[in-house]
Design a protein with these regions (language model features):
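Long, low-complexity, mixed-charge
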Residues: 1-116, 120
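Conserved beta-strand/loop scaffold segments within soluble protein domains that form the structured core
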Residues: 5, 102-362, 376-405
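Short alpha-helical scaffolding segments that buttress acidic/His motifs in well-ordered protein cores
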Residues: 370-371
Length: 405
């Protein structure tokens, strides 16, 4: 299956030059339902949603949003001060938000994918948490592709006003039997003064999917933005480099990335943070477990203000003789008082550690899984995650317990 345009025999596209014609056209006629009553979904698909942390029929009062192919379903939050609305409808209700937030954190001319989203109808969600409102339970959203070789084009905007807090769990996935498709997303996050926004995103794709998320965040004074990303079943080709602008004084950002890579997959997962606010800080931590694909881990910290402090840590574990991991942590200082550090490590599991654990009664598979679990323990906040999602995350280490080649 050819998914790319080839410019030459020597240069077959890896992260760009996606052949849009290899996929079905984006469906423009989007249907919206302010209820899940009309949702027709198989039990197998419900289980897949739960595995990425999205339970559509629990008792949560924070609201829900599901984009299922070209259909949108959502529930109005039962908590005062939070709203979730399909983006196109939000622009009709609040015309001013388009001027204020639409392609302000992401450049519409960044590449072909942002241009594609810009030229299409606005499909996605608008979430806003009002001033000083603290949402104590996670809000669940999902982007579910259920048609073979389809194209999903999404634009999501999240706004946290001053002093607000929210944990957003988003599952992006394909139907259990699907092989391929193209998923394009623009996400824009605006974290107001003193607010805290945690975004937990889980990807679970079929073997021939191409995925292109384009994300930007703007963080104001004393605010915190945390991005947790898990890739459980990777796409055939995923490339993303989310950008965060720490605009305010004492603004903070943390990226925590965990991914598993398998044969014939390409994962280019990065993150760039511009520390423009005085005494702003950032931490980028990435862990990759490679079973035979190609992984590029990048992280760029830009210190542009007095007192800026940051650290980037990219590490990879090779579980097979095949596959590639490239760790590319980067630092750029444009202010004399910015202080930044980085580290990177790539290797295989030490057989001595496996032998030691076996001497304590574990078999080889259990020992390897335990070591990988420790490698992946990077301090991600798990409060509020459903048990199904916690089990999915644990499976990354358990899969590794099948041994090395």
């Amino acid at each position: 299956m050819k998914l790319y345009k080839s410019k030459s025999k020597e240069k077959k596209a890896k992260t760009t030059d996606v052949d849009f014609s290899a996929f079905n056209e984006i469906e423009e006629n989007v249907e919206t339902y302010n209820s899940f009553d009309n949702l027709k979904i198989e039990q197998e698909e419900m289980n897949a949603l739960k595995a990425v942390g999205v339970n559509l029929f629990d008792e949560s009062v924070a609201g829900k949003f599901l984009m299922y192919g070209n259909k949108i379903y959502w529930l109005i939050p039962q908590i005062s001060g939070i709203e979730i609305i399909p983006l196109r409808e939000a622009f009709q209700i609040y015309p001013e938000i388009k001027e204020k937030y639409y392609f302000k954190a992401v450049d519409k001319d960044q590449d072909d994918f942002t241009q594609t989203v810009y030229k299409r109808e606005q499909n996605g969600y608008f979430i806003r948490v009002k001033k000083n409102v603290h949402v104590d339970v996670p809000l669940h959203t999902a982007m579910f592709m259920h048609r073979e070789m389809s194209t999903m084009c999404v634009h999501n905007i999240v706004v946290l006003e001053e002093g607000a807090s929210l944990h957003l769990i988003t599952g992006c996935l394909s139907g259990c039997t699907l092989q391929g498709g193209l998923h394009i997303t623009v996400g824009e996050y605006y974290v107001g003064k003193g607010a805290k926004f945690i975004s937990t995103m889980v990807h679970d794709w079929g073997p021939e999917f191409v995925v292109r998320p384009r994300t930007g965040a703007i963080v104001e004074d004393d605010a915190t933005y945390v991005s947790n990303y898990y890739s459980v079943n990777p796409a055939r080709d995923i490339q993303m480099n989310p950008f965060t602008h720490l605009k305010g004084k004492n603004a903070n950002a943390k990226y925590m990335t965990i991914l598993a890579s398998f044969p014939d997959t390409f994962c280019d997962i990065g993150g760039t943070v511009l520390m423009d606010g005085e005494n702003s800080g950032a931490e980028l931590v990435a862990r990759a477990v490679n079973h035979g694909g190609k992984v590029i881990q990048t992280g760029l910290l830009i210190g542009a203000a007095k007192g800026a402090r940051a650290h980037v840590d990219c590490s990879g574990l090779m579980m097979t003789n095949k596959g590639i991991i490239e760790a590319v942590p980067g630092l750029r200082s444009i202010h004399p008082d910015a202080r930044m550090s980085h580290e990177a490590a790539i290797g295989r599991i030490d057989t001595g550690e496996v032998n030691y654990l076996q001497s304590k009664g574990l078999d080889e598979m259990q020992a390897v899984a335990l070591i990988v679990r420790g490698f992946l323990d990077i301090g991600v906040e798990t409060e509020g995650l459903d048990p199904e999602l916690e089990r999915t995350i644990q499976e990354i280490s358990e899969l590794s317990g099948h041994g090395e080649d």
